């Protein structure tokens, strides 16, 4: 893989709106002297990317997923106990941009749905990567390359991907409970609200008469 091809690849990814940053050659660690904040320094700026790879021509290519509006299912398919095949049996996995990782796993890259959260583990041997980053072809790790299985555009992330996120499930449950509790509280107080409204309405009707009445004492009422 030539230096020119690596730079061209990084610039090509950036032209798609993907936020790119340099990673230490043959490693997964951000290139510290160039990106002090790691993947948070990722950019789409062609000028900045050219400057980085001019200074570090052999740097791996890192992709900040969240900043790029992407989410990745990282499947360790090379592990004997990987549970992805069983997990996906009753679900639809859209065809999408797919990459072979250097370790022998698979990256399914999707467009993230706005407002969804994608942290944590999907199942045994499968991670959902969103808040961090992945390496892109033609990067290498421990001498092994990343390479694309296809050149498809990232498909929209399936709904079940977000639903599997513990944080997303907890947030949805909390919102539903809050809405239900609020509605129940309002309904319970409704009779009292109606009663108070009627009293106020009647008081307004009698107010002119009361104003015309002369003051009187309690003894006058007996």
Q: What function would you assign to each model-found segment?
A:
Residues 22, 114, 140, 169-222:
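Modules that initiate DNA replication and primer synthesis
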Residues 1-176:
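Conserved phosphate/metal-binding and DNA-contacting active-site motifs used
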């Amino acid at each position: 893989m030539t230096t020119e091809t690596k730079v061209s690849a990084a610039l090509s990814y950036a032209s798609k709106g993907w936020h790119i940053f340099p990673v230490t050659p043959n490693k997964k660690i951000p290139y510290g002297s160039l990106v002090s904040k790691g993947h948070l320094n990722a950019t789409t700026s062609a000028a900045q990317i050219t400057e980085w790879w001019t200074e570090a021509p052999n740097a791996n290519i890192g992709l900040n997923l969240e900043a790029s509006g992407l989410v990745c299912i990282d499947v360790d398919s090379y592990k004997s106990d990987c549970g992805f095949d069983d997990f996906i049996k009753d679900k639809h996995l859209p065809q999408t941009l797919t990459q072979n990782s250097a370790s022998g796993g698979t990256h399914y890259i999707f467009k993230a749905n706005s407002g969804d959260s994608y942290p944590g583990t999907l199942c045994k041997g499968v991670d959902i990567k969103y808040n961090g980053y992945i390496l892109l072809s033609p990067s290498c790790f421990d001498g092994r390359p990343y390479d694309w299985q296809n050149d498809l555009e990232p498909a929209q992330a399936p709904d079940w991907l977000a639903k599997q996120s513990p944080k997303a499930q907890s947030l949805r449950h909390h919102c539903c409970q809050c809405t239900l509790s609020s509605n129940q509280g309002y309904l319970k107080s409704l009779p009292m609200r109606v009663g108070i409204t009627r009293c106020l309405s009647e008081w307004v009707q009698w107010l002119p008469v009361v104003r015309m009445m002369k003051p009187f004492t309690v003894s006058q009422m007996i």
